[in-house]
Amino acid sequence: MNPTAIFDYLQGLQTRIVEAIELVDGKRFLHDSWQRAEGGGGTSCMLEEGNVFERAGIGFSHVIGNKLPPSASVAHPEAAGRSWQAMGVSLVFHPRNPYVPTVHMNVRFFVAEKPGEEPIWWFGGGMDLTPYYGFEEDAVHFHRTCRDAVAPFGEQYYPRFKKECDDYFYLKHRKEARGIGGIFFDDFNELGFEQSFAFQRSVGDAFINAYLPIVQRRKDIPYSERERDFQAYRRGRYVEFNLIYDRGTIFGLQSNGRTESILLSMPPIVKWRYDWKPEAGSPEARLYSDFITGRDWLTEHK
């Protein structure tokens, strides 16, 4: 096990993604390095009021603690209470144009240790897409890129982690999906350290190709106040999910994490409406009927 190699990879991944987004947007990220009193620190990179992105945050963190909160692992309750290290890169990009989808990506590593015992470690991560106005071409491209990232490790991983993603990014109180999914994995160590780390790298390295071609296709589509209004309404679902269900948010708050970094995923403008329903047959209604339904995009588009 080599946490230093993971640390170096994650820092490099953050830098590569920041540079790629700056090329598309034309505006620079603010870099905010921070330290955590209990141990560790990180760098939060934030782009606000950009040309393409209204708010884009990508954070690297490496935090250390003496007692692991239970929220850190559903599958490894025996790790609770051990000393621990957690490191990861997490991003959420909220575009200005409603025809460009919001995206989330995260890759992370946990290790929990106790003197005289074997360390308990695992990787987690994934990426998922949240369109406001859906395009089948974009959904297929995103899912195909996710599949290709994990295929070298076994054909079973894409369908397994697509289902994990669909199940995880689901708002139970709304009975609806947050978006069109992607892949999601957690508590992952079944390939041994080196191959599990390679799996994580493959997912992280796939992000730019999964998302930026979609941004380039959609960022110049004309839109009106109607589309912006629906975008703000749907962003409300993003806020609800992150504050109620998201394990990273809950873990960060339980472990006395840095609030500004934990909440960098929040959209800048959000609206709620009482019992609103889209007009039948409208492009807004099509999002619900045709896109956020857990479709098997790659079986449909072989």
Curated annotation (Swiss-Prot):
Single GO term (MF): coproporphyrinogen oxidase activity
Binding site for a divalent metal cation: 94, 104, 143, 173
Cofactor: a divalent metal cation
Keyword Cytoplasm in record: yes
InterPro entries: Coprogen_oxidase_aer, Coprogen_oxidase_aer_sf
Enzyme class (EC, first level): oxidoreductase
Keywords in alphabetical order: Cytoplasm, Heme biosynthesis, Metal-binding, Oxidoreductase, Porphyrin biosynthesis
Catalytic reaction equation(s): coproporphyrinogen III + O2 + 2 H(+) = protoporphyrinogen IX + 2 CO2 + 2 H2O
Annotated localization: Cytoplasm
Entry keyword Oxidoreductase: yes
Coiled-coil ranges from the UniProt annotation: none
Annotated region described as Important for dimerization, given as residue ranges: 238-273
Organism superkingdom: Bacteria
GO cellular component: cytoplasm
EC number in record: 1.3.3.3
GO biological process: protoporphyrinogen IX biosynthetic process
Pathway: Porphyrin-containing compound metabolism; protoporphyrin-IX biosynthesis; protoporphyrinogen-IX from coproporphyrinogen-III (O2 route): step 1/1
Active site: 104
Pfam families referenced in this protein's UniProt entry, alphabetically: Coprogen_oxidas
Site (Important for dimerization): 173
Binding site for substrate: 90, 106-108
Subunit structure: Homodimer.
Record function comment: Involved in the heme biosynthesis. Catalyzes the aerobic oxidative decarboxylation of propionate groups of rings A and B of coproporphyrinogen-III to yield the vinyl groups in protoporphyrinogen-IX.
Protein family according to the UniProt entry: Belongs to the aerobic coproporphyrinogen-III oxidase family.
Protein known as: Oxygen-dependent coproporphyrinogen-III oxidase
Source lineage: Bacteria, Pseudomonadati, Pseudomonadota, Betaproteobacteria, Nitrosomonadales
